[in-house]
Structures are given as C-alpha cells and as structure tokens.
C-alpha cells in the first residue's frame, strides 16, 4: 500500500517484527542446537572436562546416563536435597532464583498469551503490543482502530487512489462518543484497553510478591535447618573490628569477654599486619609453579630418551631432614640425568646470561625462601584492631554477633559472623575500619564513573547500528541493506544483540576486580558487591541508555532535555523487539554454549603450545570456580526486562520463560558436575536477589503509571499508586523483619538440631570445611605435603 501518512498501511515485510523475530529465533536455535549436539558428543569423549567433579573422592555425585539425551531427564529428576548437598547452600539459592523465575513467568506468560495479546490485537491491531505511549491526536485515535482502517480502505476515496482529506470525511467523524471519555483524566476513545492494563499490573505485581515471599520463606527455613545442623569452626566464630589498643592482645581480649560472661571462648586470633609474610608466600608460590613446570619438562625428556626418572625421595618439603644439608648436597643428581634437565638463562628476563639447570636454580630459590618464611614466623607484627573469636557454642556466636557489646572506640566495637577461614582476604584485614570506609566509598565512586563513561560507547553503538544513521552516513550501504531483506533483518536483530552480548560478557570481570579492591574481608562479600555493581551497569547501559540512544533523535533530545520523559515513554515500546531478540540469543543460543566451555577447551590447546602437556592437562582437569558475581546479574536483568515489558509487549514473557528453563538446566549441571563454588555466603545472596526483583517491579509500575499519564488517563495512574506504595512497603518489611533470618540462625533451630547427632550431610565435603583462623604463613598443617606434584608426567 502506498498510503502511510498515519503509519497504518505500511505493509513492507522488512518492517514486520515477526519476520525479524523468526530470523533471530532460527539463528539462535541453530547456534544452540549445534552446541547441544557437540556437548552430547564431547561429554562422552572428555568426561574429565565436562564432569570434572565426578573425579573428586568423597563427593558422591548422582550418576547421569551415558546416552546422548537420557542424561537430561536424569538431571531434571535430581531432587533439591541432593542439589543442596552437592552444590552447596549458595548454589541451591542460585538455582532457586531460576525456579522462582520459571514459576512467575509461567503465570505471566499464560496471562499474556491468553488475555493481553488478544486485547492488544483487538484495541491496537497489534498482538505484540508495539504501542505508542504518548498522547496522539484525535485523528490518530480514529485511524488506529482496526474497524476504521477497514472502512477507509473500502471507501471510494482510498480505492480511487486519492489522497485522504479529513475535511471530506467531515469534522463530525472525529467527535468522540460516550460519556466516560468526556470526563477529564479517564481514557479517551480507543483506549479502553488501559483499564485492563491497570488490572493486569495488579495481577502481575501481586503474584511476583507472592512467589518472592514464598521463596524467601522456603530459603529461610532451609537455611536455618541446614546451618543449625553444622558444628564447624566457622559457625562458632565471630569477627570483631574496632578494637582499641588495650584490647589488641590475646590475654586482654579474652579477659574482656570473660568479664562480659557471654560464653566460653574456644580460641582467639588477633589480626596482625603480615604484609612481609605475604610477599614471601607470593615468591614461594611463584617458585613452586616454576619448579613444577620444569620438573614436568624433565619427566617428559626422560620419557623421550628412555631414562628412568629420579625416585620420589627428591620431593621437596621444608620439614624434611634433607633440607638440613647444604643446597649443593640436596640438589646433587646423577650425571645421566643432566641431559634431561631443562636449562634457562637468569639475566634480563631470561634473555642473557649463562645457561644453568632450571630445576637446581628454582630448588635453591625455594629452599632459600622457605628458610626466610621460617624465620619470619618469629617476627613481631603490629596489630590491626581486628580479631577472630571462636566460642565453644554456636548459639553464643549468634548472640554475640547480634549484640551491641561496647563503644570502646569512636565507631564502637563491630561484631559480625566470621567468614570461612579459607575465604578470608587476609590482606584486607591489615587496614583499619576508617581506611576501609573511605576505600569502599572511593571504589563506589569509581564504579559510578565507569558506568557513566561506558554509556558513551554503548550509546554510540546503539546509534550507528541504526538503519537511519547508516542511510545518513553511508547512503549506498543503507540502500543495499534496504534492498536485501535478510541483511536488513540481521542489522535489526542479530547484530545489535551480538554486540551487546559481548559487552555483557566482558563487564562482570571488571566489576569483580573493582569489588576485590574495596577492602572487603572475604571473597563471598566481594561476590555480592560484584552482583550489585554489574546489575547497576546493565540497568543503566543496556536499559536506560539503549532505550534513549536507540534512536537518531538523540541529538534533538540533547538540545531539548525537557522532552526527556515524553521521549523515553515513546521509545520504550519500540525497543521491545531488541530486548526480545536479546533474550532469544542469550537463552536459546548462548546458554547451550556454556556447556561446551569453549574458553577452557581453547585455552587447553593454546597452553599445550607453551607449557608441558602434564601442566596443561592438570589445568584442564581442574573444575572452574563458579562466581555468582559473573553469572547472576544477567538473569536478574532479564527478569527486569520481562517485568517492564510484561504488559506492553507480552510476547517477551514467553521467551523469558524459555530463557529461565534453559538457564536452570545449564546451571544445575554446571553447579553439580562442572564447577566449584568456594565462597561461603550461606545463602545471604537471596537478599540481593529479593531487593533487585522489588526494584524491577517498581520500574514496571512506574512505567505503567507513565503510560496512563501520557495517554491523559490520570485517574488510572493514581489507581496504580497504592500498588507502588504496597510494593515499597514490602521491601521495607523484608529489610526490617525477614532479612535477619537470612543472616543469622535462630536459637530454636540450634537447640533443636544440635541436640541430635550431626547428620552425614553436615559432614559432607560441601559443608565447606574452613580450617583454622590462622594466616597461611603460620599454618603448619600443609608443611608435610609435597611442594610439587611429581606424578604429573
């Protein structure tokens, strides 16, 4: 059709969202299906890569079928208690978020497909809900009706090819009929669907709050029961900071707590500034890795030449009697092995100097640094005003952590439950509380600046991959893209989502590093802070900025900032296609690729070119670390998108449901069979998830209130306001009443469960045995272990 003055007769198939969606879906499906096929094949070929945790003794992981597809059903049928035992409490909470998302999106998708989409089709002529939020002219109300469109097309004026003349139709045709529409603040003619939008805003919001609070209760009960059965050192230990100088000694601090009569103390560890010890340990670790590398080369050379290797008595350990002899006696080896020993140059990065035996060189270095560490243990290190106190009772630790003990310093004594000993960032215990306070705010400011600065490349990409911009900057390329429907569809769907997927994949590592610089006491805290930073980055750059910058009108917007609200309200529904394409690519295309572990597989072949085969294989067989700071923000952001578009464009709910189903299966397999989660946050991650979901619900409600206001339906906007208040109050209630149960363990559960014998579950490997609260430089428990693994040949 030629007539498009009101945008209602445009039949260009290249501008059909469903056509673009089909292209994106089939591209993502091809990518995901190929990844699934390769995984099913590689899983049988390289079991040590795709299920490395099955080789660890004592885990007792459930066995999956060896067939190509039956393993998927076995994975689905693994019960929650087994998942909790195998993946840990944090892994269980992570998967529960996906289960909650599946439950919510199933309900919302049902509403969207059965009710909202037909409503959009009837009132707007578009089932996908690509509506304009701003208030159109009355003539646009008229022409937006499907019945009026049909009558105009059949009219002789249009049939004869004449231009449409409003005057010919008569001004009376545009007078709205009806009493309610004449009342200021109520929907205008053609906007009756807004009443249903308000109703479904209530339905979706209330159901989201229901699944959030029901999941919170489930997690709280499981967490209380799970932790109450434990009797580990971690569960009986508190971390205290802000100690004055007179309490920075073991005797005085113990006497102080004995005077308070809060409970019997089992052990006490004063934190000191062990910076010098950390330097020595870092050097020792470097020498051990070098020695392991060259020993592997030596074993490989011996195998090639058919020479027997040295006996296991040449393992190096600082406590062995051999170290009492001189380095020359220790490093003496039979002459026939000299030709197998690798040689290195020690001057100027290994470029100049005489070649010497690498094993002898680094063995001497290791011996020397071990002696330095032994001597450094007798040094007197300054205290840092912090300490770990382990009580004999878990209940005592829980009470002390929730009690205001004293105000000995300006900020008072601060007591909290201690992280696991193997999760502590010891170098952050060297700095005082004021230093941590200012350092934390400085990193927060840096994060804020990075998020804002990142809007420049994100906004530029959003503009330059727009067809209007391409036509203006490169007319020939723009015409070529217009003439090729498939290329046009790729530009509108696959290319933008692929580019932004790369941004989404890179940013988590930056924000995890920033969190590590914040001075936090444990890696678990760093993970939680990384989740918040990355989520804020995704919200600002991939929601707000893309909605604004995804139009060539951004330059006009910069000149007239007063039109920001009107422009944002108009742009939001028009970006629904991009977000649907993003969810399709991430869920159907990218999630299956995670199972293949292309990064680990490619790094293995690259490492084999530079390091011995044994070292590459050892890295290849080691389970990767599962980081919630990297994997959690994106699903929370996808849930935010689904919430905001749940009523405007309900089709997004269907693909959001697919995203969460595939993500649940992928992460369930990874947490049980592929990855370790060494952090120990004991399920406190749920508080972060809960508040971000409330934030998404508030954004959705504000969007719907803006829709009503910009359509001049002010009364309907005020109807949504009580729901907004109820949602905010729910978040406040969570923070004041429920959040404590996500941080502490109730005395009732402790008394009930610890009166019985500890179950085997609490003795499992997944209970995250923490060791003792001693700096690694003073921990003698690992001294008898060989420094290098000579069995890797």
From Swiss-Prot:
Q: Which residues lie on this side of the membrane: Lumenal?
A: 1-21, 117-192, 466-493, 556-577, 668-687, 735-793
**Which residue ranges does UniProt annotate as crossing the membrane?**
22-42, 96-116, 193-213, 445-465, 494-514, 535-555, 578-598, 647-667, 688-708, 714-734
What does the entry list under GO cellular component?
A: fungal-type vacuole membrane; plasma membrane
Keyword set, alphabetical order: Calcium, Ion channel, Ion transport, Membrane, Transmembrane, Transmembrane helix, Transport, Vacuole
- Which SUPFAM superfamilies does this entry report, sorted A to Z? RNA-binding domain, RBD
- Name recorded for this polypeptide: Calcium permeable stress-gated cation channel 1
Region Disordered: start and end of each range?
Answer: 759-778
Which Pfam families does this one have?
A: PHM7_cyt, RSN1_7TM, RSN1_TM
First-listed, main subcellular location of the protein, grouped into a coarse class: membrane
Summarize the protein's role.
Answer: Acts as an osmosensitive calcium-permeable cation channel.
């Amino acid at each position: 059709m030629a007539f498009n003055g009101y945008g209602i007769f445009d039949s260009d198939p290249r501008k059909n969202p469903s056509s673009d969606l089909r292209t994106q879906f089939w591209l993502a499906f091809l990518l995901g299906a190929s990844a699934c096929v390769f995984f099913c094949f590689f899983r049988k070929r390289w079991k040590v890569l795709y299920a490395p945790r099955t080789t660890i003794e004592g885990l007792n992981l459930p066995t999956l079928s060896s067939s190509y597809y039956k393993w998927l059903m076995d994975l689905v049928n693994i019960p929650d208690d087994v998942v909790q035992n195998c993946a840990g409490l944090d892994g269980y909470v992570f998967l529960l978020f996906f289960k909650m998302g599946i439950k919510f999106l199933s309900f919302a998708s049902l509403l969207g497909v059965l009710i909202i989409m037909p409503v959009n089709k009837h009132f707007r002529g578009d089932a996908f809900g690509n509506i304009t939020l701003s208030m159109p002219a009355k003539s646009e109300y008229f022409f937006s009706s499907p019945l009026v469109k049909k009558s105009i097309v059949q009219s002789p004026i249009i049939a004869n090819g004449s231009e449409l003349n409003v005057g010919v139709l008569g001004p009376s045709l545009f007078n709205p009929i009806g009493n309610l529409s004449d009342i200021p603040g109520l929907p205008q003619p053609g906007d009756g669907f807004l009443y249903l939008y308000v109703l479904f805003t209530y339905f979706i919001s209330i159901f989201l709050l229901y699944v959030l609070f029901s999941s919170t209760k489930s997690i709280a009960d499981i967490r209380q029961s799970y932790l109450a059965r434990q009797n580990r050192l971690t569960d009986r230990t508190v971390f205290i900071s802000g100690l004055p100088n007179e309490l920075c000694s073991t005797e005085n601090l113990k006497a102080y707590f004995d005077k308070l009569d809060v409970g019997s103390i089992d052990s006490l560890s004063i934190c000191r500034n062990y910076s010098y010890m950390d330097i020595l340990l870092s050097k020792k670790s470097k020498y051990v890795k070098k020695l392991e590398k060259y020993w592997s080369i030596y074993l490989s050379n011996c195998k090639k030449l058919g020479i027997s290797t040295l006996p296991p008595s040449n393992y190096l350990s600082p406590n062995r009697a051999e170290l009492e002899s001189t380095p020359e006696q220790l490093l003496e080896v039979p002459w026939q092995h000299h030709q197998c020993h690798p040689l290195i140059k020690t001057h100027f990065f290994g470029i100049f100097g005489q070649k010497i035996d690498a094993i002898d060189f680094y063995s001497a270095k290791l011996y020397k640094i071990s002696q330095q560490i032994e001597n450094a243990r007798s040094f007197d290190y300054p205290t840092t005003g912090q300490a770990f106190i382990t009580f004999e009772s878990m209940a005592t630790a829980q009470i002390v952590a929730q009690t205001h003990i004293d105000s000995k310093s300006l900020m008072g004594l601060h007591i909290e439950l201690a992280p696991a000993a193997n999760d502590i960032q010891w170098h952050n215990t060297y700095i005082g509380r004021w230093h941590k306070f200012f350092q934390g705010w400085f990193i927060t400011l840096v994060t804020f600046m990075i998020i804002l600065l990142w809007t420049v490349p994100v906004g530029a990409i959003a503009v330059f991959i727009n067809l209007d911009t391409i036509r203006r900057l490169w007319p020939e390329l723009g015409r070529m893209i217009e003439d090729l429907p498939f290329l046009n569809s790729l530009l509108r769907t696959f290319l933008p989502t692929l580019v932004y997927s790369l941004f989404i994949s890179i940013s988590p590592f930056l924000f995890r590093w920033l969190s590590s610089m914040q001075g936090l006491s444990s890696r678990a805290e760093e993970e939680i802070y990384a989740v918040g930073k990355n989520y804020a980055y995704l919200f600002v750059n991939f929601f707000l900025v893309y909605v604004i910058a995804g139009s060539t009108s951004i330059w006009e917007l910069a000149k007239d900032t007063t039109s920001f609200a009107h422009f944002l309200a108009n742009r939001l529904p028009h970006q629904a296609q991009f977000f649907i394409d993003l969810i399709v690519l991430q869920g159907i295309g990218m999630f299956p690729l995670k199972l293949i572990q292309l990064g680990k597989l490619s790094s293995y072949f690259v490492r084999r070119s530079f390091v011995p085969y044994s070292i590459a294989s050892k890295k290849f067989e080691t389970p990767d670390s599962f980081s919630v700071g990297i994997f959690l923000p994106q699903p929370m952001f996808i849930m935010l998108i689904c919430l905001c578009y749940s009523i405007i464009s309900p089709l997004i709910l269907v693909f959001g449901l697919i995203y969460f189903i595939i993500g649940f299966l992928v992460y369930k397999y990874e947490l049980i069979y592929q990855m370790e989660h060494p952090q120990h946050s004991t399920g406190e991650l749920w508080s972060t998830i809960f508040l971000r979901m409330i934030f998404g619900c508030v954004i959705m409600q504000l969007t719907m209130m803006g829709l009503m206001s910009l359509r001049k339906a002010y009364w309907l906007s005020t109807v949504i306001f009580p729901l907004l208040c109820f949602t905010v109050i729910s978040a406040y209630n969570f923070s004041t009443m429920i959040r404590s149960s996500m941080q502490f363990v109730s005395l009732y559960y402790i008394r009930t469960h610890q009166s019985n014998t500890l179950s085997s579950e609490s003795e499992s490997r997944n209970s995250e045995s923490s060791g003792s609260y001693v700096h690694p430089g003073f921990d003698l428990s690992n001294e008898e272990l060989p420094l290098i693994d000579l069995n890797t040949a």
